[in-house]
Amino acid sequence: APILPDFAICDECKSELKDPMNRRYNHPFINCTNCGPRFSLIKSLPYDRINTTMGKFNMCKQCQDEYKDPTNRRYHAQPVACKNCGPKLSYKSLDGKIIANNTEALKRCIDDLKDGKIIAIKGVGGFHLVCDALNSEAVSSLKERKRRPHKPLAIMCKDLDMACDYAYINESEAKILNSNLKPIVLLKSKNNLPKSISSGVGSVGIFLPPTPLHIMLLDRLNSPIIATSANPSKEPILTNFDELASRLGSVCDYALDNDRDI
């Protein structure tokens, strides 16, 4: 069987993520057979949980029941987990000190983004450097630290409505933005973002949150963010904290990490 790519969060998981009555309410790693990481977790074939980086997380009874139930949409979903048995968030300084965990980790990250800090956030396939897209000082600082003063940056918006605040979007562009790969789409800018983002080209790259963690972050921040890959020039994206700290420790202020390996 072909190895599937990583898919952005599906509508059903998104509903559960925001439902206070659901046991996966605010679970930053919610997924099912229709969405979530695949390619980024596989260590070897066949594609079974034991051969993925989720193998170290033992499923709780409830997750196990879902995994074994052919009528459940989490039937044989290899990355399935919940708050009780799944990966955890940690907010760290670049010397490796853990400042906060889980809900508090996300809260501290958001507070620091509001304060103009640059945060490395571990996504499905690697770390991204993130700052508040409406804070022109933070944007300039990120470009300076990354030594890419003239390279345009993409912004992540919490939803289509927010994206429409900053770009002109037609029906086909909206469809692509909302697709299950959540690609960056180059759009005609409304020119109300800090000029350094698009380097004056008249267009802006926008994408919507691909993961539950990004949805939770943007819902609370209520501002678009810059999200650019955390990689030294002409090298692949960094995927673990130790690499990040040693290679890009001077570029970001803090890191929002998790213990699900890539």
Q: Where do the model's predicted regions map?
A:
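Active-site-adjacent structural elements in enzyme catalytic cores
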Residues: 2-262
